[in-house]
Curated annotation (Swiss-Prot):
Span list, region Disordered: 21-49
GO molecular function per UniProt: adenyl-nucleotide exchange factor activity; protein homodimerization activity; protein-folding chaperone binding; unfolded protein binding
Protein name, as recorded: Protein GrpE
GO cellular component: cytoplasm
Family: Belongs to the GrpE family.
Subcellular location per the Swiss-Prot or TrEMBL entry: Cytoplasm
InterPro entries xref list: GrpE (IPR000740), GrpE_coiled_coil (IPR013805), GrpE_head (IPR009012)
Ranges of biased composition (kind: Acidic residues): 23-42
Function: Participates actively in the response to hyperosmotic and heat shock by preventing the aggregation of stress-denatured proteins, in association with DnaK and GrpE. It is the nucleotide exchange factor for DnaK and may function as a thermosensor. Unfolded proteins bind initially to DnaJ; upon interaction with the DnaJ-bound protein, DnaK hydrolyzes its bound ATP, resulting in the formation of a stable complex. GrpE releases ADP from DnaK; ATP binding to DnaK triggers the release of the substrate protein, thus completing the reaction cycle.
PANTHER family: GRPE PROTEIN (PTHR21237), GRPE PROTEIN HOMOLOG, MITOCHONDRIAL (PTHR21237:SF23)
Keywords: Chaperone, Cytoplasm, Stress response
Length: 190
């Protein structure tokens, strides 16, 4: 019986060890599964958070670009409106300039009565004043500038008349603000 007890105890202790090992393996397996599940759960959340942040950054960049583009469109539109407003009378001024030239030619005719001459001068002056109010100015003819003058004839320069000085103006030139409407036709010493 002593042998039986010994065997029983041994078998019992082996079986308890197996149970303990199984229990420990189960606990370890459960802990490992929980850890893996936690890691798996944390990883998608982190990825989702990162993705959400990236998308938010992307949307913010798109918004900022769209906002900047809208500001540029508004600025360009405003500049275009200002340019149109500034030069709105360009076509009208170009159409009126030949009439102004005709008034100048009529005033140059000899034999006009004082009343007719005064009437032509008043008409010319009121026309010039109306053009000035719109920003139309006569081109200066101090010295030749190819940007504002058209040389229709040249004369040889001498001591009295240096090169690039204007001898005579055939037709006055006009500009609207800084934009040339018509160059002055001049005779130039060369």
């Amino acid at each position: 019986m002593a042998v039986f007890n010994k065997l029983f105890k041994r078998r019992h202790s082996v079986s308890e060890e197996i149970k303990k090992d199984d229990l420990q393996e189960e606990v370890e397996a459960t802990e490992t599964e929980e850890t893996v599940e936690e890691v798996i759960e944390e990883t998608p959340e982190k990825s989702e958070l990162e993705l959400a942040n990236e998308r938010a950054d992307e949307f913010e960049n798109k918004y900022l670009r769209a906002h900047a583009e809208m500001q540029n469109i508004q600025r360009r539109s405003s500049e275009e409106r200002q340019q149109l407003q500034r030069y709105r009378s360009q076509d009208l001024a170009k159409a009126i300039l030949p009439s102004l030239d005709n008034l100048e030619r009529a005033l140059a005719v000899e034999g006009l009565t004082d009343d007719v001459k005064k009437g032509l001068e008043m008409t010319r002056d009121s026309l010039i004043q109306a053009l000035k109010e719109e920003g139309v100015e006569e081109v200066e003819v101090d010295s030749f500038d190819h940007n504002f003058h058209m040389a229709v004839q040249t004369l040889p320069a001498d001591d009295e008349h240096p090169a690039d000085s204007i001898a005579e103006v055939f037709q006055k030139g006009y500009k609207l603000h800084e934009r040339l409407l018509r160059p002055a036709m001049v005779v130039v010493y060369n």
